[in-house]
Design a protein with these regions (language model features):
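Short functional micro-motifs and their immediate structural scaffolds
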Residues: 2-7, 44
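Short alpha-helix plus adjacent loop in nuclease-associated cores
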Residues: 190-211
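Short, positively charged, Gly/Tyr-enriched micro-motifs
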Residues: 14-119, 155-159, 172, 314-315
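Glycine-rich phosphate-binding "P-loop"
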Residues: 48-55, 126-142
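Structural motif
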Residues: 141-149
């Protein structure tokens, strides 16, 4: 310092820092200049609290990083820390997620989610750790192939199981990408197909009765009870306005089925299929499908043909403990992020926020 000329302090800079006692707080930072007598070089005093040529304090940057990992919009973060949205956006753009093409999880979960304007994005996740393997801008087969072919064949052969929904578009490329992997269809979608067939059948039978009649009103008002697994029906009494008396859900089912033998046939078939599926009796499940294939209506027949087409993959779903449940939970979080931000125009920002 003896070899430097000291100049006066500059005008204080207003540096935002973290709130104090709930009030916005500014740091009035004064900077002093020094000039070396030998080389004539002028320098400015520095502090670890603020980086050089920056007007945002380090605690603010660290807080922005922390809040970006939470389910908050950029605007909400900016308002909370009393900074601009562009500052938050710059920090978001600094996040990097390098890809490791030397390993893949044993169990992969595949699905898609809506990103904007009806466009679907592809997501792959580790079933066991819930770590996101990748998010692609679209769910086209070419895009998925191009990404996973970046992994050496030896690495791709380590994948033993892949869980997918029943759309059928992923099954052909899974066999190409992961030659040693078993395909497991998501159990939720299997049950959903059965449930929709039962609902469609109930509506068709219901429409054969007059609107004011008791059978029509019973099938319409108590449809949830008819859709539910009979083993999970409550034993508690409740007052049914349709029947005008206090009944248990099981008694409601019995009274409703008395109106139609056809409805009783499909209800019993539906419940038996649910039983064998949940008890992991795959042989009985498919025997029941084959025996009743030519006896059921078009709604059930379409579902049965689909199940028989994917018999191997549905058998895996029944016998193995893997499903897309964890990935669906991740998709729920993605939808929450998208809803809070009112959508993302930039897919890169959306992807970074998800990671």
């Amino acid at each position: 310092q003896e070899k430097c000329i000291k100049y006066d302090f500059q005008m204080p800079s207003k540096i935002p820092i973290l709130d104090c006692q709930g009030f916005p707080t500014l740091l009035l930072l004064k900077k002093r200049r020094f000039q070396c007598k030998s080389c004539q070089k002028v320098t400015v005093s520095e502090t670890p609290l603020v980086k050089k040529n920056c007007q945002i304090s380090q605690p603010i940057w660290e807080k922005v990083t922390q809040l970006l990992t939470e389910n908050m919009t950029n605007l909400a973060i900016a308002r909370r820390l009393h900074i601009s949205v562009s500052v938050v956006q710059r920090k978001l753009a600094q996040f990097q997620f390098p890809q490791d093409f030397t390993k893949l999880p044993k169990v992969l979960s595949w699905d898609e989610f809506s990103r904007n304007k009806g466009k679907l994005a592809f997501i792959a996740q580790d079933f066991e750790t819930r770590h996101i393997v990748t998010i692609l801008e679209n769910n086209r087969q070419a895009s998925i192939k191009n990404y996973f072919y970046k992994y050496p064949r030896v690495v791709r052969e380590t994948v033993k199981f892949v869980t997918v929904d029943m759309s059928g578009s992923y099954i052909p490329i899974i066999k190409q990408l992961f030659p040693r992997a078993k395909i497991v269809l998501d159990r939720f979608h299997i049950i959903q197909h059965l449930s929709r067939a039962m609902m469609s059948t109930r509506i068709d039978i219901m429409k054969t009765f007059d609107t004011p009649s008791l059978p029509y009103r019973a099938m319409k008002n108590h449809w949830r009870i008819l859709q539910k697994d009979s083993r999970k029906l409550s034993q508690n009494l409740f007052y049914s306005r349709t029947f005008g008396q206090t009944l248990t859900p099981k008694e409601v089912v019995q009274k409703t089925l008395e109106f139609s033998d056809q409805l009783k046939f499909y209800y019993d078939l539906y419940q038996i299929l649910l039983f064998h599926f949940q008890e992991k009796n795959s042989n009985y499940f498919f025997e029941l499908l084959e025996d009743n294939l030519n006896l059921v209506n078009p709604a059930f027949k379409t579902v049965f043909k689909t199940f028989l087409k994917y018999k191997t993959y549905i058998t895996n779903a029944i016998e193995l403990p893997y499903s897309n449940a964890k990935l669906e939970a991740t998709n729920k979080l993605i939808k929450d992020i998208k809803r809070q931000a009112f959508g993302f125009r930039n897919f890169k920002n959306f992807k970074t926020k998800i990671y």
